Amino acid sequence: MAKQDWMVVGITCMVIALSGASRVCAGEQGQPTVGQAYPALASGVLKKAVLVEMDPGTLLTSEGLEIKASRITEAVEAADPGVKEELEKNRFFLLEQETVKALLLEEAASSGADQQGLSEREVIQAHLDRKFRDIQVSDEEAKAFYDANKETVGGLAFEQVKEPVKEVLARQKRQGSVASYLQGLGRNREIRVNRDWVQAQHAPAMDNLVDRARRSGKPTMVEFGAEGCVPCDMMQPILDRLRKKYPDELNVVFVHVGENRILGARYGIRSIPVQVFYDENGDELFRHVGFYAEPEVLKQLAKLGVE
């Protein structure tokens, strides 16, 4: 199958873009949330966490849950050398992942399923498998995908690629369902994070290709991909033409997810290629998965005022 499904990285349990979390808001607490103070920092479960003063050794508290700074430091030190440098700049991301892990373990325990002899990772995986094992893809859905992505299957007939297409779509469907489920984690609980620590993490986390472009004041198109991925390689000439056509009007950014695994995880990249379009304020307006034909790209750019 030419379209490559590429899992970016598992730091603690999974790397999935999250959105939504605690219902705590600044109006209730009189203190800002992470999402209000640092809009681009949190990718999900901590967006609505309240920033409060804490002991330097404590990073997060919430109804029986406490995460210490030492836990994040240990995770960085134990990381693969290939991602350790990137993790040093993304400790807040690790805190989010540790929070997701803890909340998922709570959910799994409350389900009453037998966990004897299982590792934490196995408990989480079994819990998610039980919840989303019945997801299927119809022939009609597979055909619609095939019709929209004929360029990536090398001219093969639908019947020749139907089953691989259905496997990829089912995997993506499960990932989407998991993401929706994760949106509800922590929704009914108060989550508090260390104000000073989060402030210190903001600058290093924003020091990357994507966030710098989003803060430039110009519209931005980001391509998340990798070399050797057929649809990714097909996108490169399009990106080159865009750079030449709009040198002053548009940021065109390519992120190699193999070399920027944490950045890809932060931006919820589960399959490649992915094209994400941001307006001049850095707000995401649209994203697309798979090869994206140049006429369609130009339509999205026109919506951003780039013509």
Task: Please annotate each region the language model reported.
Residues 268-276:
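Structural micro-motif
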Residues 217-220, 224-228, 271:
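Short pre-active-site segment immediately N-terminal to redox-active cysteine/selenocysteine motifs
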Residues 279-307:
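Non-catalytic, surface beta->alpha helical segment in thiol-disulfide oxidoreductase systems
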Residues 26-51, 152-216:
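A C-terminal, polar beta->alpha supersecondary segment
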Residues 1-89, 148, 191, 207, ...:
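Short, low-structural-confidence N-terminal segments
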Residues 233-245:
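Typically the conserved alpha-helix immediately C-terminal to a functionally engaged Cys/Sec
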Residues 224, 243, 248-261:
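Thiol-based oxidoreductase modules, predominantly thioredoxin-like and allied folds used
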Residues 57, 87-143, 151-192:
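Solvent-exposed, amphipathic alpha-helical "stalk/arm" or coiled-coil-like segments used as scaffolds
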